[in-house]
Swiss-Prot record:
Signal peptide annotation: none
Membrane spanning stretches: none
Positions of S-adenosyl-L-methionine binding: 40, 52, 81
Region (Disordered): 1-32
InterPro entries reported in the protein's UniProt record: Lys/N-term_MeTrsfase_sf, SAM-dependent_MTases_sf
GO molecular function: methyltransferase activity
SUPFAM superfamilies per the UniProt record, alphabetical: S-adenosyl-L-methionine-dependent methyltransferases (SSF53335)
Residue positions of motif Required for methyltransferase activity: 140-146
Swiss-Prot/TrEMBL GO biological process terms: methylation
Lineage: Eukaryota, Fungi, Dikarya, Ascomycota, Pezizomycotina
Family statement: Belongs to the methyltransferase superfamily.
Protein name, entry field: Methyltransferase srdJ
Keywords linked to the UniProt accession: Methyltransferase, S-adenosyl-L-methionine, Transferase
Induction line: Expression is up-regulated during sexual development. Expression is also up-regulated during confrontation with the arthropod fungivore Drosophila melanogaster.
Length: 233
């Protein structure tokens, strides 16, 4: 179980994509193509459950203060890049009934629907196959305004396609948020949302230490971000 520490700064960090291998063990292997649909299709052919960075049971307490501020159980929640996580199940268990789950890969849709059916005996949440960098092209999303958007390392995967892809995702979320809506994002990067072009005011609301194999290993954190939309122009 990870210990969660609140934090107001982004200092004192390293991230998985910048960690070098130990001396004598060779260079770090290349990163997978996390931004490619083909990668996720191949992965989800065999994977049925996986939690990126932190378990949903760790993420939910970080969301609690924001869930309590939502207008009611029918508040609109957008869950981007749900993959094979069970976060949407935990949100429904919490009592929310208007949850839209979006993923790039159709196999994730099958996994998500099956998981919900197994947990509740029915499927009431919405599942949409879509590119999170092009939300405006999805009528089911662009016609709605969401009170809460959540992602767990989806922006990290999209960042493999470059900063413009992350900005496109952020702009789509900005357009999709209700006036009082917020975006909560978990990332391994202390600099994921540093772009001055980002249409959000950004705050780190928690640092989550990663597990260490040895006591002498460096401290590595994951970051939970609160992104509040800047005024729409």
């Amino acid at each position: 179980m990870f210990q969660v520490q609140t934090a107001g700064t982004r200092t004192g960090t390293s991230s998985p994509d910048t960690t070098t291998s130990e001396a004598g063990l060779g260079s770090t292997p290349p990163m997978p193509d996390f931004d490619k649909q083909s990668y996720w299709h191949q992965r989800f052919e065999s994977e049925t459950a996986f939690e990126w960075l932190i378990p949903s049971s760790t993420f939910m307490p970080l969301l609690e203060a924001f869930l309590n501020k939502l207008p009611g159980s029918d508040a609109r929640i957008l869950h981007l890049g749900f993959g094979t996580s069970d976060l949407q199940v935990q949100l429904r268990t919490r009592g929310f009934v208007n949850i839209t789950n979006v993923d790039y890969e159709p196999l994730a849709i099958e996994r998500g629907r099956h998981l919900e059916m197994t947990a509740f005996g029915d499927v009431t949440m919405q599942y949409i196959t879509a590119d999170a960098t092009n939300l405006a092209s999805v009528p089911e999303i662009s016609s709605q305004k969401y009170h809460l958007v959540v992602d767990k390392s989806t922006a990290d995967a999209i960042s493999c396609a470059g900063d413009d892809a992350v900005l496109a995702m952020a702009q789509g979320i900005h357009r999709s948020l209700a006036d009082d809506g917020v975006w909560i994002s978990v990332s391994y990067s202390a600099f994921r949302y540093d772009s001055p072009q980002l249409p959000f005011d950004v705050e780190v609301i928690a640092r989550i230490p990663t597990a260490k194999a040895r006591a002498t290993d460096p401290d590595i954190y994951h970051y939970c971000y609160l992104l509040r939309p800047k005024p729409k122009v």
